[in-house]
Every structure is written in structure tokens, then in C-alpha cells.
From Swiss-Prot:
Residues 497-508 have a biased composition (Acidic residues). InterPro entries: AAA+_ATPase (IPR003593), ATPase_AAA_core (IPR003959), P-loop_NTPase (IPR027417), Rep_factor-C_lsu (IPR023935), RFC_lid (IPR047854). Residues 421-516 are annotated as: Disordered. This is Replication factor C large subunit. Part of the RFC clamp loader complex which loads the PCNA sliding clamp onto DNA. It comes from Haloquadratum walsbyi (strain DSM 16790 / HBSQ001). The gene is rfcL.
Amino acid sequence: MTDWTERYRPTTLSAVRGNNAARDEFIEWAESWDDHHESVVLHGAPGVGKTSAAHALASDMGWETVELNASDQRTSDVIERLAGRAAKNATLAGAVSGTTSTRQLIIMDEADNIHYQYDRGGKQAVTTLLKDANQPIVLIANEYYDMSRGLRNAAQDIEFRDISARSIVPVLRNILRKENIEFEEAALKQIAEVNSGDLRAAIKDLQTTVEGSDRITVDDVKTGGRDRAMGLFSFLDSVLKEDAAEEALQNSYDVDETPDDLLKWVEDKVPLVYDDAELARAYEFLSNADIWTNRVYATDYNYRWWRYATDNLAGGVAAARETQRGGWTRYGGAPYRSTRDSTRDTVVREVAKTGGFSMATARTAVIPFLSAITHLCKPRSLTVGMAAWYELDEAGVSYITGSGETTKKVASIVEDAAERRSEAVEAHAGSAFAETETEEKTNFTGNQDSDVDVQSHKSAESGDDTVRTANTPAEDHAQSGASETASATESASDSDASTDTDADDDDGQAGLSEFM
């Protein structure tokens, strides 16, 4: 299947949506180029139409194009040989005639990323090229101020702003009509809003959602797994096909998945795209990412190691690719069982609803913390309290603790949690599990058959010091709100910090604080 972002790329500037002011300024630059011979930088967020505008302008002006992509090595020799030859040689494509219709538009993508070792000398070569060229040159950048001062001073700049959802919807509507696919208008609006002004991502999500269907509804969008800041398939395209290492790494921060899940996705899908040599290099980076991910668990859930895993699985795998790739890739489903994926989504919703967190916070911060302090259902009393507070079933307890779903241990924990909830209701407590000190010994630590020893009971009565000692790294993670997970963990941190100082607090999170 052809990639819709390529099939429906605008062929004329009048079809470029959402940046009318930038479009008009770009046209003026081109039409007056003979007077100023100045190059131009188109800058703005990914997916707002910068590259499409450059190609559409060339089509409107009757200019040929010479393109130097981020995937090309951009040393001074390469730049002078490829782009310099087109810009300086007046005989190319009949430019000797001096007519504008025979000019060549030189397009250099990702001009803000000319800094890797293989681009050594590239910045100076481009700066020199901009000053001496007698052909129009367009530089394309996501971050204008990541470009060197020399490049910025040598070219005019035009900013492309994020495209509003209102401007994205007509584009999606037009595509579906050409594809003879029926649609609900609300579904298109939802896709446009989810993609936060990124037209390219919206088109990719649209194609993913309607794949194999002749109709798209709101329910299709809701169940399509696209409630992420950046879609997983857009992220995979970024890493495996489109973007340089730095941009791929930045995009990984916008995906609402933990690094260990992203690792599974990239590892599962990279063979669909890379050739043998690229695949060998990519697997080296994935192996490194796996080592860093395992170190998180080997160090009592020290999440600072995740950053190194992400560097390898996103930036490293992107760097292993020799060229950019276009076209459509059928990535297929999740790399792990769909039942597990469904369980995860259910648990995320329950934790978010009960704790008053956002879905993103529950998924990337709270659940990893709960997994750390209840790993393999230990300590049992804490696991029972968690299951009771969040009303988890066996699948939910199994998912968070990493235990087998059908084990007797998990089943007994769920039964005890249900009993705990019943007792709390009967006691008419202001908070479900904020028991008195007397009740705490019976309810929080469990009955005399509990696998927690007498010393653990005493510790629970005095503030659960034993549990704190056993789980210090995870506890510290929740209290510190470490930047490696998310600043949004403050709600979980506040609940934890209140255990000692606000045990009698009667707000909605008191039960969670007590169980922590």
C-alpha cells in the first residue's frame, strides 16, 4: 500500500494548508530571487509542510530540484560535489540560458542536524555555498536556533507554524473521498486534535485506522490505540525510515510508552525495514538497550537507566540506517499478546480513575512504581492493599506484580482485597483504607496465616518501616519525582510523602497514602 503522505503530497503551493502567511512569503522570495540571490530557511515543527512546500514551489516555478537529505553524508566534499555542482555550474539543466524556468532548487533537509562526526566540515561548506550560490537554495530545519549562527546569518528565515485541527480536517476529508471511504466527521476531528497540529502524523494515523476497511467511525479512532502524544507507528517511521538520530530520540519522548515497551516494538519491527548490514548494526544498539533496561530491575527499579536504553533503541537504531525510506510499511500488531495489551489498558484506566491521575501518568509513572513495590506479590500485605484500593481483578494483580495470572497466590490476594473493601464499607471509614492503629494490625497486615512475619506486623504498626527499607529505591523514586519518568508523578509522590505526616488526612488520596 502506498504511503498516503506521499500519494497526497501537494503538487502546488496553493494546496499547502495551514500556513498561508509563510506560503505567501515563500512565493515572494522565489519570485524576487533574481534581485537578491538569497537562500531561505523554512523552519518549524515536524509535519507542518516545510518539505512539501519546497517541492510544490519548484513545481509552480518550473524549477528542477536537487535534494540533499539527512541520510546522506554531508561532509564538505559531498556538499560541494552534490549541491555545489548544481548551484555553481550554470550549464546544469540549461541554466546557461539564464531563464528562471531552467533553474534548479537545491533542498537541504534537516539543516539543524549538521553536527555529527560524518558531517565534519559540513557547516562551513554549506555556509560558503549559501554565500556563493547562483541557484536558489532552501534549507529545512525543525529547530531554527539549533543551526549555526553562520547558517542563520546567511539566509532569510520563514517560520511554518503548527497546523490547526480546523485546517487538518479538510485534508483528511479530501483523502477519504478520493479513496472512496465513508467517514464520520467526528472521527476526522478526533484524529486532527490528537495529532496536535502535525498534518503528516494525522494522515499516517488516518491510513492506519482505515486499513482494510471502507468506513471510519469515532469508535474506530477510540479503539485504534492512538491516544498517545505521538503514535507508535509514527514513532516507528521516525526511527526506522525517516529521521536522523537526534530527532528520532526526541520523538521517543513524545510516545506514551515506557522504554521497555518501545524496545519490544522496535526490536519486533526493525526486520521489516532494514537490510542485513543495517540490521546487524541495529541489533547491537538494541542489545545495549536491553542491557540498560535490565539494569533498571537489577538495581531495585532505578529508572535513571531508562534514558540510556532510549538513547540506543531510538537514536542508535536510527543511526544504524544508511538511507531514508519512503513508502508504506505494514507493521502489524503489538509485539506482545493482545490480551496483555488489553489488560494493561484496563489497569491503566482503573489506576488513573481511582488515583485521579491522567492516563499518561498512570501508565508511565504510577504503575511502574506499584510494580516495583509489589514485585511477585511481595510483601503480600502491601499487594492486598493495592488490589483493594484499585479494585484489581486477578489479571490486574498479575500484570502489575509480574506474577502468573492463575496462581493460587494471586487468587487469594484478590479474595483478601475484596474482604478488605467490605470491611472498610462496613466501618464507614472516611477513606477506604485509612484505618485506625488498632484496625491496621488486623486489616493492613492480614490474618495470622499471612506470610508476613511478626516483626513485619510490628513494623507496619509503626509506619511500615520494613516495607520502606525493602523498597527504598522505588520509594525514593516516587518521593523525588525523578525527571526520568515524568514530572506528573507528583501526585503519587505527594501521596507517599503524606504517609508519615498526614496519616489522618481525609481527602480522596488518603487510602492510597496509607497503603503505600
